[in-house]
Amino acid sequence: MASEAHTRTALIGRWFAWLDRARIAWVAVGDDHAIAAGAGNDVDLLVAPRQLAAIPRLIRRFARANRLRLVQDIQHEAVARFFVLAWEDDDGRPGFLYLDIAGDYWRHGRRFVPVAPVLQRRVRASALGAGGERITYWRPAPADNLLYYLLKKIDKGSLPDAACATLARDWRRDPAGARQALVGYLPSAAVELVAIAVITGRWQPVQRVLPALRDRLATATRLGPPAVAAESMRRVLRCCRPTGLVVQVDESSEADEVARDWAKAFRRVVVVRTDRPPGLLCRLLLIWPQVMATTLVVFASSAATVPGAVRLAASARLRNRALGLHLARRHAMGGGGRYLSLTV
């Protein structure tokens, strides 16, 4: 039986080849070592903006060709979509592949990194996957990858050891280019902190200034009317097409198993153990906001039916299959919305 990491890296290699056959201009950004290892991280891709509209259709075709289920399609930015593809292993448990695909790199309605120069400087690279297979992909120039990855970590407010190693590796490949890339986004003092951290291996000073850098980035770019309109439309669509789900099982142990197996397909999981169905006010004020925030709400209740919940069987294999099919049907018609075109 192939491990989940082995299956994931094989699928990543096929997806990259699928993009090339479709003549999509793309690049894989971030920690390419983790991608090749099938570590379960998001596969972050930047795509030529004019080709973004073709991506959802390609995803669905790829899923059908590889017997996968598209279980999440989340538009987390006006020009960025997060897809989760699922498969079933020999034990009936789900495995997941995460694809985060965007045009220009946007966060909170602001454009951080335009993708056109990144695609112009991309290079072909390869790495060995978890099962020994060779994965070929497009990689950004070192300075471009460092800029993208550092901005993403600043925005998240977290810089773990693996991320520090990736940043140091890219800086050493092109020190002058890395310094020049950061100067346009970070204060000179912060750029020097990164340069010193690469040499010394001590990233604590950089980690301490992450909150200040995050605040600076959040206010550095003014939102023009097109960006405001696109961000507003995205928020409306997220409310109309919630990406969370409410399910119900009979036993508390079954709820824990559902939470364990499907946590990676949602942003959060909440388990509710009760013998009384939630009232209308509870559903509107407590449950519905969770569902809009991509939360899986699992009710363990055999005494009453939870309104609007998907009832799952007692068998783990049947539970996982039914939940996967339900999510796949929800996205079969491309219900996650469209990439929005921005002119800024």
Question: Positions of the model-derived regions?
Answer:
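Conserved NTP-donor binding/palm subdomain of two-metal-ion nucleotidyltransferases/polymerases, i.e.
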Residues: 1-41, 47-245
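Flexible, charged surface loops at secondary-structure boundaries
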Residues: 19-21, 39, 93, 239-241, ...
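Conserved beta-strand segments of alpha/beta enzyme cores
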Residues: 25, 270, 338-340
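Structural motif
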Residues: 49-50, 102-104, 248-252, 273-277, ...
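NTP-dependent small-molecule kinase module
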Residues: 210-238, 307-344
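Conserved nucleotide-sensing/catalytic segment adjacent to the nucleotide-binding pocket
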Residues: 267-310
